[in-house]
Amino acid sequence: MYEFVVNDRNYLNYRFFDNLNNEIMLPINPLNFKLFNNSFFDYDLINENITNVQQPVINDIPGVLILNKTFGKYKNKFLYKCVPYDTSLPIFLVPYKVVLGFNKETVNKYVRFSFLHWDDKHPIGELIECIGDVNNISSYYQYELVFRKLKYSIKSLQNNAFKQVKQINDATIEDIKTKYNCEDYTNSNKNYIFTIDPSDCKDFDDAVSINNNIINVYIANVAVWLDYFKLWEIMSDRVSTIYLPDSKISMLPTILSDDICSLRKNKKRFAICMSLVIKNNEIVDVSFKNTMIKVANNFVYDEDKLKKNKNYRELFNTLTNLKNTFNIKIKDSHDVIMYLMITMNYYCSLRLKKNKIGIFREVKIKDNDMNRDKISILPENIKTFYRLYRNVTANYTLEPGNYDSLHHDFLESYVHITSPIRRIVDLLNLIQFQTSENIYHFSNQAISFYDKWVNKLLKINLDMKSIRKLQRSEEHTSELQSHSDLVCR
């Protein structure tokens, strides 16, 4: 069989390949035979005809519906051109009924459509969903989610979680505390626990306390709730919370992310705790345990109330005097949290590496021959920009290796575990870490959930890359402007 590959929607640049993947010349016009990109077929040399055509499945296509001109009718609806986001697909005709508003303005639409048939010049499509107007920022982001294959339903998980949460009472909390071996840290006189986050934050997944020479870092134990409520099998395929200028698309239903799992003030919550013992300005011991905590305050970064808090001041002074802070200069509360999260990720990675399990973070600088001595003398803001600009590859892997990043160079291993409310990898590492450290052995459903995602590590990396692209504001602005230019009157 032969394969047809096209690079533009006008079919001006296309190629044919044989079954050995060798490029060949065939005397056929792909438009005459209505071939889509990546179609396979047999070629009859004598009759100059193609047979056994195997077209790719085209059942959910994002595109822009152009409403300034009609092209006939199909089943009592006018046909309009629809330009697919995928530039390898030709322009379709899609039936649509225009509804004029008060101002009589016809605005092009972001849509999802499917392929029906291709009998004439343009293939015919069928509308699946009208996402919204091209000059609407929310519609644009929904359109991008569809194209980047990041639109996953959490309806089943949301409904089930809501039913479970409604039944939570004091007995439930005590049952979880006992079952998951959680030490009681809810006495604020002994453990003044607080969070530091942006002002609009609701999904608090990390907290901290300090008591003399011991710093405790607490991470929301999302795995405990999912395990207790038996939610593993209905988890969605979302790999991360997505932060957009106009909204947040949570990895978990908000009843979990912003409420039950979130380390909210004055609420009993479950967290895995890392204890750092400080002596002579060095970390001399690190230990982990499951805890039940009650946060005393949800602070905002650098607010006056935080700066005046004696516990925060003690924490800040202790960290600024530490001898090793992974090249992080601790100047404010942002640096405090950054250092503590890096520290926990690092020490957890050492344990996971020793036990030969876990999902590790691998980040490489594009220029491996970069002269670090010269870079080190640059002003901090320029150095940050330079290294962030050069940093182009970041993946998750099952193999621990050198971790090269903006603030902490060449750690022998590194994992993400401190944001389990927001990232699937952190949740997966949280499961394995507790198992490997004999903190708690989760259910078979939890282990199956972990194994399923380990086998889909490529998908995690691809989706995370797509999410990073989607969150780049510069790209949003230019794309939205180009689509808004298509507004018709």
Summary of predicted features, one role per range:
Residues 288-291, 301-478, 489:
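Append "with occasional cross-activation on large, charged helical scaffolds in nucleic-acid assemblies
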Residues 83-87, 206-210, 275-278, 288-290, ...:
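Short beta-strand elements
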Residues 225, 234-235, 279-282, 347-355, ...:
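Secondary-structure transition/capping motifs at alpha-helix termini
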Residues 241-328:
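Conserved catalytic alpha/beta cores of large enzymes that bind or transform nucleotide phosphates
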